[in-house]
A protein has these predicted regions:
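Extended active-site neighborhood of metal-dependent phosphoesterases/phosphodiesterases
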Residues: 79-238
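N-terminal active-site segment of His-dependent metallophosphoesterases
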Residues: 1-84, 91-116
């Protein structure tokens, strides 16, 4: 059995690029806050199947072929391991009592799922769901796979958004801080960032942290967002 691109995500992380969603569609996904919940249901479904539909052969193992995390954060890996091996997951970072992601910002660019504001997604038929994020951040349980599992390393397990190198420390510092990254002061720098995300350009190397836009929102800092390489982690356990 194969899993791939599970992308367990800390959707409240300040080190994300949702504001580039009109350039890169994967920069914001309306369902991303439910990643661990969906993953736990995937595990339950595999456990219920037990064997292949054509061969009727019992599963020997599950192999997940990369991009187990979305943004190479330690907390994303922790949630992924609990999803695969079993355990209680609280899919929340920062403020322990509320959601601090873009979906509660009131910005019509994003899916404001549980408030009354109209947005681009609701205009296309996405529903309003009361108390959605209260349910998202409530503890839930994954049963863990009934068979052994193994995982392969992916680019999202090693780089910011699977594209930008962690050695670019100006952005690296944003992970565990309070400033929500919303781009740079100069449009040329934002264009360079978009190129880096879309085609792996290294043109960000000469951009200084002093040019970051610091007028955006703030979030509650969380040390668990530290990138994996800064924790000495260079892969994931099986």
């Amino acid at each position: 059995m194969q899993f791939t691109d599970v992308h367990i995500i800390d959707a409240q992380s300040p080190m994300r690029f949702e504001f580039l969603g009109n350039i890169n569609g994967s920069a914001f996904r309306p369902h991303e806050s439910m990643g661990t919940h969906g993953g736990a249901q995937l595990v339950s479904r595999v456990n219920s199947l037990k064997k292949g539909p054509f061969s009727n052969r019992p599963f020997d193992c599950v192999v997940t072929t990369g991009d187990n995390t979305d943004n190479c954060e330690h907390i994303e890996l922790e949630w992924f391991l609990k999803m695969m091996s079993g355990g209680t997951i609280t899919a929340n970072t920062g403020d322990p009592t509320s959601w601090e992601g873009v979906q509660t910002s009131g910005d019509r660019t994003y899916y404001n799922v549980d408030n009354s504001i109209g947005d681009n997604f609701k205009a296309r038929g996405f529903p309003h769901i009361d108390d959605f994020f209260d349910h998202v951040i409530a503890p839930h349980t994954s049963p863990g796979l009934d068979v052994p599992w193994y995982c392969v390393f992916g680019n999202h397990d090693d780089q910011m958004s699977g594209t930008l190198p962690l050695w670019w420390t100006d952005l690296n510092k944003v992970f565990t801080g309070t400033m929500k990254f919303t781009g740079f002061l100069y449009d040329t720098n934002n264009q360079a960032l978009a190129r880096a995300l879309n085609n792996g350009s290294s043109s960000l190397a000469n951009i200084s942290a002093r040019t970051m836009n610091r007028s955006g929102s703030t979030v509650t800092a969380d040390a668990r967002r530290l990138p994996l390489h800064d924790q000495g982690v260079h892969g994931c356990a099986s």
